[in-house]
């Protein structure tokens, strides 16, 4: 184990799955398919072996958060205020963050039927393309400087204080923020925050997004595997874009397969790999839990912070 993981306990898949009594998966195969991202791969067995124990662990942290909040209120002689439980999920582009986030949202909704479980992606806090063009940052989209971190931190602060909060909405079809559209959040019991940058903050070194998280997950994999997944996903997106001339990716949909692969590989190496190595992976040890994926997308190792 490298020094980076010295503060983590390594748990094999075989050991991890014993931490939850065998039970039904709480969702159907059709539901699982509907929340699985393009070219991701997850099975009902993965839900039972990996995600049901994870739901149990999140419940442990939730109870601890409530107990601490209760004790603080007694100490300060203030009324007890239960705050939203915020879960941050990070990792590279194409590593499977969205699938994990949607699955956790569904499972938490099933295990906490009286709770409001919401999901927000940090894509909505990217600056609009026009602003990025004006600032000469369009080719840096996804890098730390392309996010409105002040707006994102204000959003999390409002959520944590039980206030109604609004998040911009991003569309991958148009590759931009949707004008005049907001997603509203009214004091949810759980909020899942998903994005490549959830452990970063380049604006203010004294405050990190992760300061607002009650639990956090990093989805990890070898960069060569992620590159393969990224290219496979890009090709799948192009197939879908052929049916929609208004889709941002329609301009690439007519490329010969070899050229499309070369284009995707170049984007991976010049943008996504650089972003991963310089800004995303270095934040990995800020997570409470690291889920490591093998080449077939299956989670084979789990690292839990000691």
From Swiss-Prot:
An annotated Gene Ontology molecular function: pantothenate kinase activity
Pathway annotation: Cofactor biosynthesis; coenzyme A biosynthesis; CoA from (R)-pantothenate: step 1/5
Main location: cytoplasm
Signal as UniProt keyword: no
The reaction(s) this protein catalyses: (R)-pantothenate + ATP = (R)-4'-phosphopantothenate + ADP + H(+)
Xref: Gene3D superfamilies: P-loop containing nucleotide triphosphate hydrolases
TM annotation in the entry: none
Binding-site positions, ATP: 91-98
Assigned keywords, A-Z: ATP-binding, Coenzyme A biosynthesis, Cytoplasm, Kinase, Nucleotide-binding, Transferase
Subcellular location: Cytoplasm
E.C. numbers: 2.7.1.33
Pfam families per UniProt: PRK
GO annotation (BP), single: coenzyme A biosynthetic process
Cellular compartments per GO CC: cytoplasm
Keyword Nucleotide-binding applies: yes
HAMAP family listed in its UniProt record: Pantothen_kinase_1
Family: Belongs to the prokaryotic pantothenate kinase family.
Protein name per the record: Pantothenate kinase
Biological source species: Streptococcus pyogenes serotype M1
Upper classification of the organism: Bacteria, Bacillati, Bacillota, Bacilli, Lactobacillales
Gene: coaA
């Amino acid at each position: 184990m490298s020094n980076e993981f010295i503060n983590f306990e390594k748990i094999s898949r075989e050991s991890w799955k014993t931490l939850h009594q065998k039970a039904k998966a709480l969702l159907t195969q059709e539901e699982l398919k509907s929340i699985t991202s393009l070219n991701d791969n997850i099975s009902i067995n993965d839900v039972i072996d990996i995600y049901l124990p994870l739901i149990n662990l999140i419940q442990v942290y939730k109870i601890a958060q409530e107990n601490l909040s209760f004790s603080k209120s007694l100490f300060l002689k203030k009324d007890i205020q239960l705050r939203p439980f915020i879960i941050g999920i990070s990792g590279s582009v194409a590593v499977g963050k969205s699938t994990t986030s949607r699955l956790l949202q569904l499972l938490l909704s099933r295990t906490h039927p009286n709770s409001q479980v919401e999901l927000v992606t940090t894509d909505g806090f990217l600056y609009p393309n026009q602003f990025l063009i004006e600032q000469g940052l369009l080719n840096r989209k996804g890098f730390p400087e392309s996010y409105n971190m002040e707006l994102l931190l204000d959003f999390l602060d409002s959520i944590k204080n039980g206030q109604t909060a609004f998040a911009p909405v991003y569309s991958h079809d148009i590759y931009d923020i949707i004008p005049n559209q907001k997603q509203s959040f009214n004091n949810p019991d759980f909020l899942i925050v998903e994005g490549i940058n959830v452990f970063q903050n380049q604006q203010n070194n004294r405050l990190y997004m992760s300061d607002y998280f009650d639990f956090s997950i990093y989805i990890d994999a070898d960069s060569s595997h992620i590159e393969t997944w990224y290219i496979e996903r890009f090709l799948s997106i192009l197939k879908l874009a052929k049916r929609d001339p208004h889709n941002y990716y329609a301009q690439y949909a007519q490329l010969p397969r070899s050229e499309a692969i070369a284009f995707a590989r170049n984007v991976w190496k010049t943008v996504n790999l650089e972003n991963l190595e310089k800004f995303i992976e270095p934040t990995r040890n800020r997570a409470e839990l690291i889920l490591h994926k093998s080449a077939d997308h299956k989670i084979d190792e789990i690292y839990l912070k000691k």
